[in-house]
Amino acid sequence: DLVVYTDYDKDADFGGYKTYFLPDSILEAGGHRATYWKDENAKAIINKVAAEMDARGYTRILDPEKKEEANVGLQLSYVAQTTQVITGGYWGGWWDYGFWGPWSGWYYPYPVSYSYNTNTLVMEMVDLTADEDGTQKNLPVVWYASASGFQYSGQFNQMMLQNSVVQAFEQSPYIKSVN
């Protein structure tokens, strides 16, 4: 499973929010330019977030032209990373004569390398009502969640990402609209 971390603004009035805007794509961070993940796997994650918000009494604004009418906005970001590790290697010349045979003499150690893949899904909720007059440059993040861990292939990884969305909302019972 992915490790899920959540945090929130203790002063935010989650019960006062009624509507939310959630884009139809996930920002893929990590390159020189922003790219957007829009395939059926991205849509499944987005739909899972929408279902969690809807279940808590919020109404989704689907039309991007009307997103300024939303009380909160959700931004989903995804980062996949490969880490390459190269160690100094094994020398091989320190074994006892009686156990491994005679000392083999000195030679350069061969390097040992391996790599592993990780991925992180970040969910941020911003208060869009904080900029009623249109002058605020930075909107306050009222909820933050990240799910990180090893990246697996195919549907198993997709299932873990969707499960992490559910876990993030389970860890955040304060996200609930009062209608």
Whereabouts are the PLM-identified features?
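Solvent-exposed loop/turn segments at secondary-structure junctions
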Residues: L27-A29, V79-T83, T129-A130, S148-Y152
